[in-house]
Amino acid sequence: MSTSKRVVVIATVALSACASQLVSTGKAPTFGTAVSADEVARWDISIPPSGAGLPGGSGTARQGAQVYEQKCLACHGAKGAGKPADPLAGGAGTLASRTPLRTVGSYWPYATTLFDYTRRSMPITNPLSLTDDEVYAVSAYVLYINGIIGEDAPMNAQTLPQVKMPNRDGFISDWPPRSRN
């Protein structure tokens, strides 16, 4: 039997099992557990380009270098050069080339995206483990190694949204999302 036929057979059996439960019990199968409002609030931490919702705290690149060395260096390499993970720095002037290097400094349009992504996803082995001060500091460090801010520039809820990223005008804005009618 071909792979595609096997997939169809397996899907049919699985759907039949779900349908038989619905017929026999009168209820659809349930998966997982309901999420509480508190659980949703802990994960509802998105930060838009405006910086709305950024938490208190602050950090500089000088402070961020220490956080980076302890929690980022193993994956992102010295000064954000990459290996084994993607590089965070470099790539200036490469976006129009045949081999663009898309880094925080060359590609990302908003500094708030750096904070948002770092807070929710890094370090990859322990996401959501950095304090807000650590996220501000490591964000400042990544901006610094890309030549975007000075080493002692404080990053916080007021200053981070004001950072003008080199590729800010390289995108067609869809924020806030437009109607798709």
Can you describe what each PLM-predicted range is?
Residues 65, 81-119, 123:
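Gly/Gly-Pro-rich "capping" loops immediately C-terminal to redox-active cysteine motifs
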Residues 44, 56-85, 89:
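Sequence/structural segment immediately N-terminal to covalent heme-attachment motifs in c-type
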Residues 125, 130-181:
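Flexible coil segments in periplasmic/lumen-exposed cytochrome c-class electron-transfer proteins
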Residues 62-70, 81-82, 108-111, 129-132, ...:
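Sequence context surrounding c-type heme c attachment/ligation sites in exported
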Residues 48, 69, 73, 77, ...:
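Sec-exported extracytoplasmic/periplasmic mature domains
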Residues 18-20:
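N-terminal Sec signal peptide cleavage junction
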Residues 30-67, 123-127:
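Electrostatic cytochrome c docking/interface patches
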Residues 1-9:
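Bacterial N-terminal signal peptides that target proteins for export
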